[in-house]
Amino acid sequence: MGLFNISLLLTCLMVLAIFHSCEAQNSPQDYLAVHNDARAQVGVGPMSWDANLASRAQNYANSRAGDCNLIHSGAGENLAKGGGDFTGRAAVQLWVSERPSYNYATNQCVGGKKCRHYTQVVWRNSVRLGCGRARCNNGWWFISCNYDPVGNWIGQRPY
């Protein structure tokens, strides 16, 4: 095999490895793993993937690709956007990172910080999940996860 063919083969393998590593961070299992890890930490059972919710989330993400604005659709959802290689796993980790801002005793976000993405992730009654990811016109990624049943009811604790 000539040097050119070996170089071409190595380049193809590297591209496939990069593609696989990016896609591996956006599979249903990746979204579920981060959700279910966070839920297990507070004694809440795991979620399961719902293809219908995923389809709705993907359609909504696609519809936001023009402006990439985090405008809620009205469904029970968490939204995120990010540049570079922003993945579904990274979006869920971003929501889970709000945990220190949630005070269970008062059922409030502390210090004026955000925590309601986190409370939706661990909402006990939300047992089905579907997520979508779309590339925005500005090059960023828009990620939407839908939950069923909807959580984050004002005045109720997530677990």
Swiss-Prot record:
* GO CC terms, sorted: extracellular space
What do we know about what induces or represses this protein's expression?
A: Upon infection by virulent and avirulent races of pathogens, for example fungal pathogen C.fulvum. Also induced by ethylene.
- List, alphabetically, the PROSITE patterns matched: CRISP_1 (PS01009), CRISP_2 (PS01010)
Tell me which positions the record assigns to the signal sequence: 1-24
CDD domains per the UniProt record, alphabetical = CAP_PR-1
Q: Where is the SCP domain?
A: 32-147
Question: What keywords would UniProt list here?
Answer: Antimicrobial, Disulfide bond, Fungicide, Pathogenesis-related protein, Plant defense, Pyrrolidone carboxylic acid, Signal
List, alphabetically, the InterPro entries matched.
Allrgn_V5/Tpx1_CS (IPR018244), CAP_dom (IPR014044), CAP_sf (IPR035940), CRISP-related (IPR001283)
Q: Which residues are recorded with the post-translational modification Pyrrolidone carboxylic acid?
A: Q25
Name one process (GO BP) from the record: defense response to fungus
List the disulfide bonds in this chain: C68-C136, C109-C115, C131-C145
Name the family: Belongs to the CRISP family.
Q: What does this protein do?
A: Probably involved in the defense reaction of plants against pathogens. Has antifungal activity.
Q: What is this protein called?
A: Pathogenesis-related leaf protein 6
Gene behind the chain:
PR1B1
